[in-house]
Swiss-Prot record:
GO terms for molecular function: proton-transporting ATP synthase activity, rotational mechanism. It is a peripheral membrane protein. Its main location: membrane. One of its GO terms (cellular component) is plasma membrane. This is ATP synthase subunit delta. Keywords: ATP synthesis, Cell membrane, CF(1), Hydrogen ion transport, Ion transport, Membrane, Transport. The gene is atpH. F(1)F(0) ATP synthase produces ATP from ADP in the presence of a proton or sodium gradient. F-type ATPases consist of two structural domains, F(1) containing the extramembraneous catalytic core and F(0) containing the membrane proton channel, linked together by a central stalk and a peripheral stalk. During catalysis, ATP synthesis in the catalytic domain of F(1) is coupled via a rotary mechanism of the central stalk subunits to proton translocation. This protein is part of the stalk that links CF(0) to CF(1). It either transmits conformational changes from CF(0) to CF(1) or is implicated in proton conduction. InterPro entries: ATP_synth_OSCP/delta_N_sf, ATPase_OSCP/d_CS, ATPase_OSCP/dsu. GO terms for biological process: proton motive force-driven ATP synthesis. It is found in: Cell membrane. F-type ATPases have 2 components, F(1) - the catalytic core - and F(0) - the membrane proton channel. F(1) has five subunits: alpha(3), beta(3), gamma(1), delta(1), epsilon(1). F(0) has three main subunits: a(1), b(2) and c(10-14). The alpha and beta chains form an alternating ring which encloses part of the gamma chain. F(1) is attached to F(0) by a central stalk formed by the gamma and epsilon chains, while a peripheral stalk is formed by the delta and b chains. It comes from Clostridium botulinum (strain Hall / ATCC 3502 / NCTC 13319 / Type A). It holds the Pfam family OSCP. Belongs to the ATPase delta chain family.
């Protein structure tokens, strides 16, 4: 529902990062802040606490991140606190990563297999996907024993499911329909 808003925030920060030639640094800093928030129960409690006012939350964030992140990132975080959107920072990070990929003619391909791909298989998959999408492919591999065998590929909204688990489910459905 708020994807459009997340994208606008991310685009604004991305443009600032580009102007300052710090896109990689901003992405790295934002990931670090997201991880800190996600892994700190205390920070989450503070951010969600209705009796801690916005000014105090901003002070806490300034104390926490002043010397750890670029001033523009800190300003961005403070705006998100002001607009009550800081709990959705991870969504802004994901949108900023998408923008980075788009601007650099790259696309993310999520691959699931039971065992790791061999180097040759990985290279061939990257080449074929690169030709299909006419972009540089960033491969994200995941080992998933539940697929039993085969490969699952997701590129954007496109899915190629060549897994044994899906084939077995399809066979089961066909058998149940015939009964």
């Amino acid at each position: 529902m708020y994807e459009y808003l997340d994208r606008r925030y991310a685009l604004a920060l991305y443009e600032v990062a580009e102007e300052n030639n710090k896109v990689d640094e901003y992405l790295r800093d934002l990931k670090e802040v997201v991880n800190i928030i996600k892994n700190s129960e205390d920070i989450c409690k503070i951010l969600k606490h209705p009796e801690i006012n916005t000014s105090r939350k901003k002070e806490i964030f300034t104390e926490l991140f002043k010397d750890k992140v670029d001033d523009k990132i800190l300003s961005f975080l403070l705006v998100l606190i002001e607009k009550d959107r800081i709990l959705y920072l991870e969504e802004k990070l994901k949108e900023m990563e998408k923008i980075y990929l788009e601007k650099n003619n790259m696309i993310l391909a999520n691959i699931k297999t039971v065992i790791p791909l061999l180097k040759e298989e990985r290279e061939e998959l990257i080449e074929k996907l690169g030709n299909k999408y006419n972009k540089k492919i960033i491969l994200e591999e995941e080992i998933d024993k539940s697929i039993i065998g085969g490969v699952y590929v997701r590129v954007g909204d496109d899915v190629l499911d060549g897994t044994l688990s899906t084939r077995l489910k399809d066979i089961k459905k066909m058998m149940l329909k015939r009964e």
